[in-house]
């Protein structure tokens, strides 16, 4: 095999002839030759050294340059202050200053060090060495001659790429050139940058990135104008189109200018949990001319104070949930809650638009500020201008393939600048930004991605590794960024999605480098090429010196996306933001005068085709799980917590056998370990140090975010130093790499080495311990019942992994809050609960067990509805309550229709209002629901149709006619009418398709759409709810039978009197009514809460007492009917279900002991009975009545119905009653009673009020109750409510 390559002669500028094969058009495969000057032997003789020493020094210089004086070449310790000639005379480094004889080479190949030079005289020996598989990656063969000495570099293709070997050989050439021609130059001033390097870099960096010199909200407005109805935000708490987001943000921006004086360069703090309102706030601030700064509500108050002090902010926009937190942290700031209530008043649009357009806002003004860790303990506030952000989002959208079809996950924390990239890149390019809740981020990220239909995400490798491609089949593109990519993560995702790898410090406006096509064959350190930027590799200590291709140096970013600098910190700004371009820049062609440069502090090198390879940091800044951390800031906090006599250091530790790095704090301690003698460490009890470590940790937790608090505190006798007297951080990292996580943890554990054996654990604890071991990368047998998850190195991401593993592997539920609130293994195991998964019900799934095939069923349903089968969207069974309502209305005794008459406000935008109604009609399938009967079974059908309006000329005539129109199978059960003069709206709905809560959801949604307020995401369908409670067979389960027979069994006390002849002849109809507002004395509701009681329990118990007082035997049991909300079942999203979840059940209250019980005990007993009923509340009154004769009699003799309901979200109490349309349209025409509702002679509605009381409305049959008797009954009920409530407040629980 011929290892040689053709050589070509060339002459360098100094006139010294060299011969090299590196200019071959075909890259060398195994070797390259360099012809040396003939006077080499004379030069060696002049210095009094062997010729090989000159070559070895040149080799050392080349290797040192290529590796930036790091890694395996640190041991060379060249004195950079000395001239090359001085080094030639004095330098003696035994590690490379060796002559390998032929005999040595013929020996054991494993004794030859890898990646070092060997100097031999016989080329054939080196050839043999390469061919026999030596571990030596590269070496050189020197052939001395007084006529034509030459040097051949040879490398092992299995250990080194040809391109890497070529670069090192080229560097060797340059080093030889310097040694021969410029021996007077100091080693530190030596540059091996060649013409070839210049030409290669010029080719890669020939084009200056395109700048987008515009305001970022102008880019957003372009999308609004082009696609106003496209989805802009899909969040867990609401959805917005581009037009709606534009309107809301413009309204808020006008208010910020009007009321708070926000103008260019005003910094506004934002403190939000994940929410659609955070997006509105961000956009509003930039529209107003200000710059936003996010703070994390979970960070310590000291952190909030430091950030506000750094930025001199005066205004905070926050959520209702975070307001108390931020107000306590920075009370000097004005806080403004941003939620849907903030937009309840219609603004003066003209005035606001004028304000916006009158601002003297420039792309040079600040758009946002982001704070990062600072070495002095003070956060660094990075100011990013509009032009930088606009340039960044344009470049990122193009490189990351974000467009109108993208649904982009917004996962990153708002304090992490990646969130800015997620949000503004999507919103300026027509994509939809998808926002899971904080709970979903931690507990069900895969589920959130699927529910939000996310097809593109940007995550750290740590978070991406929690997911698996199989869990998120709709995810098409995944971008890794924020921390170095891992091989494990790349291998998992590379063949499943379009995988990209990005890089970018916050000072460069999110991302400035991208590797767009990541595969298993590309190095995980490959961060690709610049996007919106040019990348340069400069000397780590001198940015005016470019590094040769392949040499490791500091990454310097140039371009319009570089930030302005650090706010009010010119010292630190001048350190890393160049005020003048580097001297070498002119040689690469013209550059805009405003070009900016940022010294990243990251080490990198040019790889194949100019792609950059990330190599680490040159200083004490690190990234841990995507968070940028200055180790010196943590050391600063440690120093403040300790005396001056105690030395400290913090390092990122990679314990042996663990892939999860942790922060380790080293503290000097008399009884500490000797880092030079780790093998002989004894783990004696160190109670005093443990107490010290606990105190320090508690103190710095008050000042630093949790991700900056060390997980390990290690006592050491002394901190290691380099020969120059600096802290030897490499030795600290090396020490940690030699020790397991368990060993390092024991160093600050007070438990002795011979601690008692592991306590016995129950199966739940053993299973959980195995998951701990997997997450924390420990041996499961080392985890004890009393171990603390957080003390063992757990953090929020580890908790997320634990929660996901518990659900996936154990089918058990655990929350992140559980992990943090109960970090002890034994306590945590007690919190494990069976996993309850919400099964999504597909269309027609609940009717597939019938006699008819699906298509035949659809045809039959369509025929009954007078429609075609393609208009049938879904079919599913009725709830027991719905079936009751429909059967009763079909009997002809009552219509079961509810009617709302709304007087529309005179200034209402009618077109917009009707459009809002139409959108909600489509959003809520229950409004498009009809009922049919197939084979004697009632089914409900969802129809694909548009809203239909009736336009009556007379309101009174329409109401009368509408009341006389009975419901019919197959026909719509929601009727919408708008009077011809557009003054009144009438909505008539069957009670089978709404309840109080769903009515509030419907009218609240109409109001929200009208006001351009985002609608919450629909996570639960009515079909899924029915699937949860549905029983395909009529008979009740045995557990239900047993419960109801026991609950309704006969008692010694008399029940209600038998039904009268009048009642038997005609069921009652509650056709009259009265109402009352009942408020409690101060402290009543608080007393309820202190006893663990609810207001609903109070209402129920008071009604039982009221009915009992009217009896001849007040101590006899009371039985009455009730309508329950039906939303007590464990089903996420059931509280916001826009459909009737009601359940009709009997209530029995045993009164025999009530006279002797204290109010608290009586109420507790009533509440316990209600709780016991929860699993059976959807059994249905008809099925309950059918159990046996005694149960039927008890149910038939119920005379009254009690309905307890909260004010649904979005409702307002007017002078007469709670009404969902009040906010939008004005008061109701009349307070219509819920007549024709059920067969009870008296109906009591109790609506729970937020101001400690009830709104009570009584409807009654005036043939059974006189108005005077009804008023007296209502008075008695009000008095009983007061008595019971007062009884709780007197001496805790006395009567």
Swiss-Prot record:
Residues 1-24 are annotated as: Disordered. Its cofactor is pantetheine 4'-phosphate. It comes from the Eukaryota. Transmembrane segments: none annotated. InterPro entries: AA_adenyl_dom (IPR010071), ACP-like_sf (IPR036736), AMP-bd_C_sf (IPR045851), AMP-binding_CS (IPR020845), AMP-dep_synth/lig_dom (IPR000873), ANL_N_sf (IPR042099), CAT-like_dom_sf (IPR023213), Condensatn (IPR001242). The keyword 4Fe-4S does not apply. GO terms for biological process: amino acid activation for nonribosomal peptide biosynthetic process; secondary metabolite biosynthetic process. GO terms for molecular function: ligase activity; phosphopantetheine binding. Residues 759-836 form the Carrier domain. Pathway: Antifungal biosynthesis. Keywords: Ligase, Phosphopantetheine, Phosphoprotein. Nonribosomal peptide synthetase; part of the gene cluster that mediates the biosynthesis of the tetrahydropyranyl antifungal agent restricticin that acts as an inhibitor of CYP51 and blocks the ergosterol biosynthesis. Within the pathway, resC catalyzes the C3 esterification of restrictinol with glycine to yield restricticin. ResC represents an example of the emerging class of single-module NRPS-like enzymes that perform esterification reactions. NRP synthetases are composed of discrete domains (adenylation (A), thiolation (T) or peptidyl carrier protein (PCP) and condensation (C) domains) which when grouped together are referred to as a single module. Each module is responsible for the recognition (via the A domain) and incorporation of a single amino acid into the growing peptide product. Thus, an NRP synthetase is generally composed of one or more modules and can terminate in a thioesterase domain (TE) that releases the newly synthesized peptide from the enzyme. Belongs to the NRP synthetase family. This is Nonribosomal peptide synthetase resC. It comes from Aspergillus sclerotiorum. The gene is resC.
